[in-house]
Amino acid sequence: MKHLYLTLILFLGFTAHAHAELRIDVTRGTIEPMPIAITSFHAEQGANGAISNDMPQVISENLERSGLFKPVNPRAFVQSTQSIVKEGIRFAEWRATNAQALVTGVLTRTNDGRTRVEFRLWDVFSEKQLTGMAYMTSESNWRRIAHIISDEIYKRLTGEDGYFDSRIVYVSENGPPTARVKRLAIMDQDGFNHKYLTDGKNLVL
């Protein structure tokens, strides 16, 4: 399997010591999903603009699938990514969207062609940064970085380890009923990055 080059280059997080810490209690029987706003990431210095939109979409889908989060509709957003970078976060306006947490990010293309991905998680009511990290990676690895960021957000807000940066190994079966071909395959937990590990010539139980 190809070696994955992923470098964590910076830890930006601070624990918010608010009167009531923003946290989902996963031990409760019935949980109301937490409203969370996940903005597009700001693309700087030649960074891929498509990725700046695709990464937040993957993060949003991951968190929503967990059943613990309810992403705010982007049409309700009160600031663009450019506005956040230039003016800072206008927390009072974000509170009007009912979002309890806010995710922002920045993509930068480095001189050696790699991509620097930075994200920050904010408590909208205390106006505090809850956590944040930056990663150096290849552009083609953007989807995995989105899963890693999803895990960081999930852990910070639930206290439990995330599972989004995990992969599923399974037996793929196809062909006519009398000549079925079984191959060992692997994919991300969300069904993307599917690859076959065997060619179907050998027996797979």
Region locations from a protein language model:
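Conserved beta-propeller blade repeats
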Residues: 142, 156, 194, 201-205
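Bacterial N-terminal signal peptides
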Residues: 7-15
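Short loop/turn segments that connect beta-strands within beta-propeller blades
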Residues: 125, 188-192
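Residue position within the beta-strands of beta-propeller blades
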Residues: 104, 168-173
